[in-house]
Amino acid sequence: MRRPKKYESGEATQYISRRAALRKLQLSLNDFRRLCILKGVYPREPKHRRRAQKGSSEIKVLYHTKDIRFLLHESIVWTLRDYKIFAKKSNRDRAIKDFRNLKRRLALFPEIKLDHIVKERYPTFIDALKDLDDCLTLLFLFSTFPSLHLIPREQSNLCRRLTIEFLHYVIASKSLRKVFISIKGYYFQAEIKGQKVTWIVPHYYPFKPQSRQEVDFKVMSIFVEFYTIMLGFTNFRLFHGLNLAYPPQFPSSVLQDSEESLKDEASFVSDRIAALNFELLRTDKVQEDEEELDIDMELLEQDGDSKRIIKMKQEAQEVSRLRTLFKGLKFFINREVPREPLVILIRSFGGKVSWDSSIFAGSTYDEGDETITHQIVDRPSITTQYISRDYIQPQWVFDCVNQRQLLPTNKYFIGETLPPHLSPFVDSKRDSYIPPEEKALLDPSLIETHAQSDDDSEDEAQEEEETVDQELLDAQLQLAYQQETAEYKKYGGPDGVNEDEEDPDDEDDNEDDDEEEEELDEKTKRLQEEKQKMSVQSGKVHKVNKRQVHKAEVDEHRLQARMVKPRHRNLFRKLIREKQTKEKEEWLLRKKRRTIEANEKEARKTAKREARKEAAAAAAKASKLGK
């Protein structure tokens, strides 16, 4: 029997170094990286590095041996080898100035086909939707780039086209659920086929070239190469699920015989598609209504799942109301406001939107239209204003979507200090610090109704002043009443007779009252004796000692810490440290909040004091002038 040698089995055979993988695949490092990105193969961290590296203590990049064997049978490997052959032959033709042969070779440039890799990595459509977050974020980022050294113009244009198509699907399906504005950009979350897809759209700033190569655009462009194929398949499937024509097309009513459409119909259509302001052509002639979440009412009769199904029904009703949140409202976007994010929001929830035709193609009505209900402005003042519309800041649209209702517009008028813009991606039931502004937004009873305006706030201020005056008047009346009663007791009643001197008629009445009370006491005693057998004694209030309860919890926690297994102690300590840091952060936030509130209170007091001093000085000055 042969004695087994060391490192011939176990963890040593499960991993392979990157250098050995390059020798096995006969590829360069750049081609190997490209192949790993396209196939979704990434380095692994072994449990025991020394065993995996066959006794070597050097830090190496390791891969699973099974993954490298999997790459051996990939057809892309042959295409990458063809790239090397093509480069050598084209350089030779260029050196000998054989341009005819070079032109022929360029026409036969080898192309990588990634269709089979997409099907291989995502066997089902739901798997592709689950991995759509990073895909959309990266493609939206590359769609804003100009032509760079490693990013050709065709790639950025393709990213722009695919992302616009996806936004058209979101608008047509009304699947948008949450939005948020941050420093990074605009966060969007849509619910597609039961899967929550979240992506970021960057802010629209002018491109600033890098002074140093801090970002490897070559690696990122390889990811984009794969994600464009993936998103193309996804858009095709999503569009056909809604009976929309793919690629996107317009009905004949939009393509009227105008000068622009007759000159260049392709550019006319592409501009209108990028505007996101027109409905797309459907494959069926009759336009289908909006998809509604139908719930079988018979399921509510089941006793076991009644609570869960009722909760599902409530959520479905909220979503159906959210889909028509802006229905019947007409918006106009000023030129200083970002157009595309607001168009996505307003159209996804049933509203109509337009802008100045000089900004971008696709506007449907101008600023002078009197049926406009809201005009979105992001400047301190505006010259001409219409009485029939509300002039609001862009945050109102985002907050309405997150709160799933139309908020009052008085807090979002031009020049107003905006309320805090809270993230909808934070769990409201979390065990951490929640600011009072967020509590006020989460509690429906604290949110003002949509019909409230500045007139209501003025009425409230007048009511507060009246209540203050009424309180002062009540205090003066109470003081006068106390003085009057004191004098009444001191000097006697209205006839000059002291209250301590009693009338004989009153004594007879008191005796009759005593007899009636004795009879009632006897009746109550008899009833108590009859019900004595069935009597229920009242319970006593048990006072809880908070210090003892806290001590018992601490002792129990220490006992649990002792009972933790030795192999789990590091994990237990890590969890305890995370909990302590979380509690410390919460305590610091509460302390900071108390400090801010104390400073604000002190500032209000000083302002009131100064106002009183100014009023007193003005009154004294007026009295001097009167004299």
UniProtKB/Swiss-Prot annotation:
Any one Gene Ontology MF annotation carried by this entry is: RNA binding
Arranged from A to Z, the UniProt key words for this protein are: Coiled coil, Nucleus, Phosphoprotein, Ribosome biogenesis, rRNA processing
What SMART domains does the record point to?
Answer: BRCT (SM00292)
Q: Where is the BRCT domain?
A: 321-414
Sequence ranges of Low complexity compositional bias = 616-627
Record's GO cellular component terms: nucleolus; nucleoplasm; PeBoW complex; preribosome, large subunit precursor
In this chain, the stretch annotated as Disordered covers 450-469, 488-566, 596-627
The family database entries (InterPro entries) matched by this protein are listed as: BRCT_dom (IPR001357), BRCT_dom_sf (IPR036420), PES (IPR010613)
The Gene Ontology biological process terms listed for this entry are: maturation of 5.8S rRNA from tricistronic rRNA transcript (SSU-rRNA, 5.8S rRNA, LSU-rRNA); maturation of LSU-rRNA from tricistronic rRNA transcript (SSU-rRNA, 5.8S rRNA, LSU-rRNA)
Spans of biased composition, class Basic and acidic residues? 522-533, 550-559, 596-615
Taking the record's annotation, the residue ranges forming a coiled coil are: 507-538, 589-625
Subcellular locations according to the entry: Nucleus, Nucleolus; Nucleus, Nucleoplasm
Bias category Acidic residues: which stretches? 454-469, 497-521
- Residues modified as Phosphoserine: 453, 457
Name the residue ranges with Basic residues bias: 540-549
The similarity annotation says:
Belongs to the pescadillo family.
**What role is this protein assigned?**
Required for maturation of ribosomal RNAs and formation of the large ribosomal subunit.
The protein's name:
Pescadillo homolog
